[in-house]
């Protein structure tokens, strides 16, 4: 993502991103404006990135479904990005009422050039010159999240979670001193606080660890934004939109003498499983199954192929539950073409993942996971690993218990 970057300045420049929950109504918009004012009063320049208010994006999507059966992608991007344009205008009005001069910018005005992939556009370059001019004039730049303009001069939507990516890209392009992602939680925790009362907020975590966490179910920040931050060395501060307490810093792996073996346990109940039975054990059959899924942007995660028996095998994979219907349709067609026996689905599964940078140098982690789950009578259906993660598919009804016992086994409540 090439960009035109500005030189370092003596006054700190902070990028602050607030999501839809944080700007859901007029009172919260004024609270965010007050937060920005206080940040400036402490001697900082601020660029503010905001999402659409509350559930406005969902409401616009429902409205489109009521109006149209075809819903052309170009027009959907025009519609969806209207939510952010509304939010930035209202935010500037609130700031002006507090004697803070501010200018609003759409993604296009802020210099975001994207590809032509409507609904999920990728940033190609950023030239935030107009934003920089506003900063230099002593004003606050308020930028619409999750949008840009394509190479063929059409408005584009960056997809869900794109406001985080907008903020990180601006932090890189403007050479900002910090990029603060404000959410409805106070940082990154050792597990979901709604599941485990003993969940502990992490003071810091590495990009690699957070990427693994977001890939297996941690909802915030958006995975794309962490990827961009890691690629361009943008240090992140994930913190609460409703308090001034410090959150979690995300940076390159710290060069400490002894790193924690495990940083987090991540529960995920949004997964389903598809099994293709009686698959001919021939070259090319796996590609015939998974290429059509990739072409339709179906997000396949774990894949297991059984040992061949009499020239046939079974292949199982997991995918998000929201993509189960389209995934099943695609796989059923592929199964018929390759002569497989049939397709079955299971939406009663879940996943629990253990993540930690110290895992690579501690070979006993996997054994501890398996023993802990076995002692609780929790059956493991599938396993996948990376250098710093082990994920297990279990029954959805066992996800909470698995999370609690693994969090306890690795003593994550003790810090």
What do the PLM-derived regions correspond to, one by one?
Residues 178-182, 236-238, 301, 382:
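Short hydrophobic alpha-helical runs that function as membrane-insertion/retention elements
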Residues 44, 100, 234, 298, ...:
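Short phosphate-binding/catalytic loops that engage adenosine nucleotides
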Residues 53, 185-187, 232-236, 240-245, ...:
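Glycine-rich beta-alpha junction loops
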Residues 1-226, 318, 394-395, 410, ...:
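Nucleotide/pyrophosphate-binding catalytic subdomain
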Residues 247-415:
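A conserved regulatory-domain signal marking ACT and ACT-like small-molecule sensing domains
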């Amino acid at each position: 993502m090439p960009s035109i970057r500005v030189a370092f300045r003596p006054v700190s420049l902070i990028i602050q991103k607030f999501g839809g929950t944080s700007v859901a109504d007029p009172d919260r918009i004024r609270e965010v404006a007050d937060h920005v004012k206080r940040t400036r009063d402490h001697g900082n320049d601020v660029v503010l990135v905001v999402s659409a208010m509350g559930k406005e994006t969902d409401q616009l999507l429902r409205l489109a479904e009521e109006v149209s059966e075809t819903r052309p992608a170009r027009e959907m991007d025009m519609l969806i990005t209207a939510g952010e344009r509304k939010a930035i205008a209202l935010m500037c009005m609130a700031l002006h009422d507090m004697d803070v001069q501010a200018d609003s910018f759409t993604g296009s005005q802020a210099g975001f050039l994207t590809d032509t992939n409507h609904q999920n556009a990728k940033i190609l370059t950023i030239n935030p010159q107009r934003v920089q001019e506003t900063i230099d004039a002593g004003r606050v730049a308020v930028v619409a999240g999750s949008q840009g303009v394509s190479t063929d001069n059409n408005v584009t939507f960056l997809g869900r979670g794109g406001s985080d990516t907008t903020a990180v890209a601006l932090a890189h392009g403007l050479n900002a001193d910090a990029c603060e992602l404000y959410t409805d939680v106070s940082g990154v925790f050792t597990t979901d606080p709604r599941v485990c009362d003993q969940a502990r907020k992490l003071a810091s975590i590495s990009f690699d660890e957070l990427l693994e966490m977001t890939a297996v179910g941690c909802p915030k920040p958006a995975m794309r934004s962490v990827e961009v931050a890691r690629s361009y060395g943008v240090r992140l501060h994930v913190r609460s939109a409703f308090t001034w307490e410090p959150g979690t810093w995300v940076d390159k792996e710290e060069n400490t003498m002894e790193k924690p073996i495990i940083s987090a346990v991540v529960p995920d109940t949004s997964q389903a499983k598809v099994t293709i039975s009686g698959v001919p054990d021939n070259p090319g059959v796996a590609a015939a199954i998974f290429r059509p899924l990739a072409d339709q942007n179906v997000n396949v995660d774990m894949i297991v192929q059984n040992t061949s028996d009499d020239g046939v095998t079974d292949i199982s994979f997991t995918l998000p539950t929201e993509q189960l219907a389209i995934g099943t349709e695609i796989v059923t067609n592929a199964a018929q073409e390759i002569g497989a026996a049939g397709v079955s689905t299971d939406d009663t599964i879940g996943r629990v993942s253990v993540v930690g940078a110290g895992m690579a140098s501690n070979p006993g982690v996997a054994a501890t996971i398996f023993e802990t789950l076995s002692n609780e009578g929790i059956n493991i259906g599938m396993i996948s690993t990376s250098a710093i993660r082990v994920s297990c598919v279990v029954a959805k009804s066992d996800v909470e218990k698995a999370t609690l016992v693994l969090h306890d086994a690795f003593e994550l409540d003790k810090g």
